[in-house]
């Protein structure tokens, strides 16, 4: 049985569902050798999912931290676990999801049968989930409550270089979807390292209010230090460490600028991870309203 909580205008929240006693969940994150906060969202989402008792086991692994993707090959030794759902906690399809993760986890396709007979099932990354648009809008509303949307420009920030082109494409796709809703005065995709540049926000926007949401999984150095600096947010206006919200409203250039933490820090991403696994299994448990 699936239990959902309906939230008017905000979709449905997965509360519980029948356990999959013969299945495990592996959440794959990027991680960082210099910023431990990079892995925090993945670990927190794993703990949330584990507490719900849906899967027999829930584990995480990382490209740049321990446990590594190679370490994960030795997880899930319980012979009762017949299926392992692998969900990349990445914002878009790209080099890591198409090349690095399959190579390191020795995946041969959508389904890979191990010598033990255990089947590893490679799911779509969280950023490709249909509810990303809803999550972006919710985050924008949460950091700028009561602000008139028709007097507001919404900026979706991605990295945006040739090395990370798919994240730029994903941001642009989300912007197009939000534009079609005709809620904000303007909706723009901006980037750290290619035009249109987030640092040029004053010239790109004309409204008295500007809301900025980083389209990133975690509050790493980009979303916590680099982007605020590019926006011109004074040092010291941020909280003491990554993973904690910045002071949301900043008065800059005669405007009200609202800056969010990275989208993937939202606790509701745990539901997205579950849904990506369940979608592979053919079970629909999360619907956006």
Label for each model-derived stretch:
Residues 3, 12-16:
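Short, positively charged and aromatic/hydrophobic N-terminal segments
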Residues 15-289:
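Active-site-proximal alpha-helix that buttresses catalytic centers in soluble enzyme cores
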């Amino acid at each position: 049985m699936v239990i959902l909580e309906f939230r008017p205008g905000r979709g449905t929240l997965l509360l519980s569902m029948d356990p999959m006693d013969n299945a495990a969940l592996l959440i794959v994150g990027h991680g960082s050798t210099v910023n431990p906060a990079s892995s925090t969202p993945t670990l927190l989402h794993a703990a949330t999912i584990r507490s719900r008792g849906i899967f027999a086991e829930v584990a995480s692994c990382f490209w740049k931290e321990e446990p590594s993707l190679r370490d994960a090959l030795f997880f899930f030794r319980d012979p009762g676990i017949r299926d392992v759902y692998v969900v990349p906690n990445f914002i878009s399809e790209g080099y890591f999801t198409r090349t690095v993760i399959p190579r390191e986890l020795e995946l041969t396709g959508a389904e890979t049968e191990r010598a033990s007979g255990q089947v590893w099932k490679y799911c779509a990354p969280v950023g490709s989930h249909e509810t990303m648009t809803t999550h972006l809008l919710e985050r924008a509303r949460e950091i700028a409550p009561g602000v008139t949307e028709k007097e507001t420009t919404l900026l979706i920030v991605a990295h945006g270089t040739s090395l990370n082109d798919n994240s730029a494409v994903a941001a642009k796709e989300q912007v197009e979807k939000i534009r079609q809703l005709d809620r904000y005065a303007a909706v723009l995709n901006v980037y750290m390292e290619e035009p249109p540049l987030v640092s040029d926000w004053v010239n790109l926007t004309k409204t008295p209010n500007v809301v900025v949401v980083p389209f990133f999984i975690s509050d790493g150095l980009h979303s916590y230090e680099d982007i605020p600096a590019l926006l011109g947010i004074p040092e010291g206006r941020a909280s003491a460490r990554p993973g904690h919200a910045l002071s949301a409203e900043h008065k800059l250039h005669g405007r009200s600028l609202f800056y969010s933490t990275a989208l993937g820090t939202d606790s509701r991403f745990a539901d997205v991870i579950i849904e990506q696994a369940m979608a592979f299994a053919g079970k629909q448990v999360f619907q956006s309203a």
